[in-house]
Amino acid sequence: MKWTARVTEAQWQTWQKEGWSMLPYIAEYPLPGGGLPPSWRRAWEDSAPYAFLLESAKGGRYTYLALNPVAILEGKGEQAVWTDLQSGEHGAIHGQPLTVMNDWIAPYRAPRVPGMPFFSGGFAGYLGYDVARSLERLPTQAADDTDIPDYVWMRVNELWIYDHETSCLYCAVHMPNPVRLSEFSSQTDLANEVMLNETASILGKHYAEAVQRTERMLTQWKNIIHAGETDPAYPLRCARLSEKGLEAVHQESEGWKTAFSQQDFEHAVKRVQEYIAQGDVFQVNLSIRQQRTLAALPENIYEWLRLLNPSPYMGMLRMPDLRIVSGSPELLVKLEDGRVSARPIAGTRRRGLTPDEDAAMAAELLSSEKERAEHIMLVDLERNDIGRIAEYGSVHVPELLTVEYYSHVMHLVSQVEGKLATGRTAIDVIAATFPGGTITGAPKVRTMEIIEELEPVRRGPYTGSLGWIDYNGNMELNIIIRTLAVQGNTAYLQTGAGIVIDSDPYREYRECRNKARAVMKAVQCGEEEAALSRSGITGG
């Protein structure tokens, strides 16, 4: 297969002298017939215990896959552990999550390859909602009833990137710089010349190794595609959807349990409205966590979710005892070449059963004074958050109150943008914007205090963020909603609704239920598929 090297050895020589700690190599392979597998079954079979997939299944440009990260950082509270997955070395770190992350990320820097995707290597993982406890002083009232980490990040030096617009596959490899410029400073001229010659030889060997690794990656990608195309479960899934349709999946809530009953939730809604009447807050996002025991593999549930509800910020993080299966539609924040952007979602209606009903629901959503007021309030909150780390006067709203459609619901969305101030970093952007205002409320700190008071259990990954930070300081993080967290054989699903002064408690409860439907249906389909597989009826 014809390929194009997007980085030359001469570029490596320049970057090596500039002192970058990591050197990127990217090979481009055109795949005009389509380059994504129908299912990711082979990818998970090939992966180490840690792996991640980030997909833009609706409207996005790139799909990212990494199967062999080189290191892991995970923490809960102020205790963290790092592990070098190549050497097996590990160690404990004590500190606030974003400080620990910053110290772990800081030594690794690489130049961006012009014209290539921003993310070609770096860090991928998630921040759970409870990382906010290190950013704001919050009470401790909700039960911490799981040992799911507050955050997990993987460092990746090999990454597959599929470009949906150009139908090209990029195989990206990052290699450590063998000798940094700073190591030359204390040497004599003759010693420096000898070292430069030796370094050029080492650099050439590293470059050749990077080329070989991308060639192996291409072969592995071909195997992943072939396995996906011959996966016996995939046509059965498609047949079920085409024969019965999405609405034929019934009783999706069967087997789910919650510590937050409908009665308790509606009482909590009324308590929020009392706080609003007192002037404490304008809006609070109140959520319900449900859980159940799983027989299905989380990987197969993800396959169902991408069929049932393709979303722009889908993804899966795979760890030894934890899977994050995300069908998120919402961006928390993006940082690309110094431009910061957020895309808040607030305002929801169910999808109509007919085109006319769908249009009527959209018109109702757009004309709702309640939904518009709530949305604009949260857009203002995002403007203020981004304004904390943006150049003065650069924050603007290029898109306001647009309807976006998903399989089971429609939402109001807007776009907020600004220019990152000099000296600010991706970690500063996270500190300013996390957690998102659309899933807490306004004002943010007081709403988080009320959430802690009224929700019976801690949120864990829910309403945190999943995504990536690259070696050049760019970043893209979603908001973890429409997401399943699976620890062992227990699945956790949480959904929320924005409560305002004129909210109807029952309607807000139903909104939470509607938002859970797509993931619950994916779970139900996965469970039924697992039962058939155990009986020998399907290859899934």
Where are these regions (language model features)?
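Extended alpha-helical targeting/anchoring segments
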Residues: 1-540
